[in-house]
Regions:
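Conserved "right-hand" nucleotidyltransferase catalytic core of DNA-directed polymerases
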Residues: 1-9, 14-15, 31, 38, ...
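Short catalytic helix/loop segments, enriched in acidic residues and glycine
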Residues: 18-40
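Active-site-proximal helix-loop-helix substrate-binding element of RNase H-like nuclease domains
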Residues: 32-57, 63-166, 178, 407-412
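Short active-site oxyanion
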Residues: 65-70, 237-239, 368-372
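Short active-site loop/helix that positions an aromatic residue
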Residues: 76-87, 101-103, 248-257, 377-391
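Cytochrome P450 catalytic domain signature, combining two hallmark sequence patches
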Residues: 89-91, 209, 257-265, 388-399
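Function-dense linear segments that define catalytic or interfacial modules
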Residues: 327-417
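Structured DNA-binding interfaces in DNA transaction proteins
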Residues: 416-441
């Protein structure tokens, strides 16, 4: 089995870049252009390739993909280019960025530059900073040669970092999980129901307006509710002006049984309302379980969309560009759990309330397949108990016993039938936390 380490250099500018749009949109965009790529087969000399798209395709077609694993530092990006732009499908995918999160934690930088320093394998160049807004044909021969050297260096860094990681004992089983995670994105097979999404978006917009009117009426702002219904720009501006008052907005939240969040002012050192659009507590209100609160907050910051609108519109945009790549981030949390990425979080689609299942049902299985939507009870605790050989816990699960109450009873020195809901929560936290190495303190 060969190892092909690869890195693509592509056109980008101030508005069209991975910092502005998702990987999916960037790679599928009509402005996409390959400047060049570098590849290294096993430990052979690294090669830089540039030229027309036809030339790039011709060179790629000569490489032994059928008998190779592909390695990159951000394989979601480079793999998508290989698959979507050039029809490449290797034996599997490897990714040093994913491996870095698992080895060094999600709170550490896993950029190629940081990893190169960590493993003392060299230094990442900065030539890419000179390529902003420059298409391939506008590079001078000297600049293009320097860009090629920069790209080859990235490949060498990635290859050497990978070798160090494997020598440190990175579990081979985890490599398969990384491959499966990346393959769901790089080789998409799901479709999106555009018509269902359109209908849901229209319903969501109507719901938002109704929720905001309901919220304004609930807090005694009947005049604002009427103006919002009228809907012209001048009246909308007046509604937002009122909502921008911290004192009035806090009072409105209180009218909906929600306490306005508080933060410590970095200027005065005293408590103040945390109602700025960048305050984390305020962001949480944008996802509040009460849609009236969501609508109030969205109106306050002048946004045109609630979270559900944004999600639905994003799905619609993807559906216009092709199959639906499933974006999951391997080792997204310190526990090792997967997480959402690329502006989509499939683990957090609504399952309750007015929008329950709407987006899920718009995701279509390939012909000949069906989706099974399941919420397996205590799946993590059951699996960990089985893998660790804790037979008493496995048996308790098999017998349908409430293991969280059993743990709580042991903690509080009482009987299972006397455990309160709060006590059960402590028992649940203990069992789940212990599975991730939580200590006694």
């Amino acid at each position: 089995m060969n190892l092909i380490t690869i890195d693509f250099e592509t056109y980008y500018d101030q508005k069209y870049s991975l910092t502005k749009i998702s990987t999916e949109e960037y790679v599928r965009h009509d402005r996409y252009e390959t400047i060049g790529f570098a590849y290294k087969i096993n430990d052979e000399r690294c090669v830089w390739v540039t030229g027309t798209n036809e030339h790039i395709q011709k060179v790629l077609d000569t490489l032994p993909w059928d008998d190779s694993l592909v390695l990159a530092h951000n394989t979601m990006f480079d793999g998508a280019i290989l698959s979507w732009r050039y029809g490449v499908k290797p034996k599997g995918w490897l990714d040093t960025m994913s491996m870095g999160r698992a080895l060094h934690g999600v709170d550490q930088s896993v950029s190629l530059a940081s990893m190169a320093v960590r493993y003392a394998v060299g230094e990442k160049g900065t030539e890419v900073m000179n390529a902003v807004g420059v298409g391939r044909e506008f590079f001078s021969p000297d600049a293009l040669a320097k860009y090629g050297a920069y790209c080859r260096n990235d490949v060498e860094l990635t290859y050497n970092i990978f070798q160090h990681m494997m020598l440190s004992g990175f579990p081979k089983g985890e490599l398969k999980l990384i491959d499966l995670t990346l393959s769901m994105f790089i080789h998409p097979v799901l479709k999106l129901d555009t018509e269902a999404l359109k209908a849901h978006l229209a319903d969501t917009v109507a719901q938002k307006k109704a929720h905001l009117v309901s919220a304004l009426q609930a807090v005694g702002k009947q005049d604002l509710a009427v103006k919002h219904i009228l809907g012209d720009e001048e009246t909308q501006a007046e509604v937002r002006k009122t909502l921008m008052s911290n004192v009035q907005f806090a009072a409105m939240l209180k009218g909906l049984d929600v306490e306005a969040p508080i933060k410590i002012s970095p200027t005065t050192g005293k408590p103040t309302l945390a109602l700025a659009k960048n305050d984390e507590a305020f962001k949480e209100l944008l996802e509040h379980e009460d849609p009236r609160v969501q609508a109030l907050c969205a109106a306050r910051i002048g946004t045109k969309s609630t979270l559900e609108e944004t999600r639905t519109q994003r799905f619609m945009d993807i559906s216009k560009r092709g199959a639906f790549p499933v974006p999951l981030r391997y080792y997204a949390a310190h526990t090792g759990r997967w997480g959402g990425t690329d502006s989509v979080n499939l683990q957090n689609l609504p399952s309750r309330g007015a929008n329950a299942g709407k987006l899920k049902k718009a995701i279509l299985a390939p012909e000949g397949y069906v989706f099974i939507d399941a919420d397996s009870s205590s799946i993590e605790a059951r699996t960990l108990a089985w893998e660790s050989g804790q037979d008493d816990l496995v048996k308790a699960f098999a017998n349908g016993e409430d293991v969280y109450k059993i743990m709580a009873a042991a903690i509080y020195g009482t009987t299972v039938d006397k455990v309160t809901d709060g006590g059960r929560f402590v028992g649940k936290t203990t069992i789940l936390g212990a599975g991730y190495g939580m200590g006694a303190a």
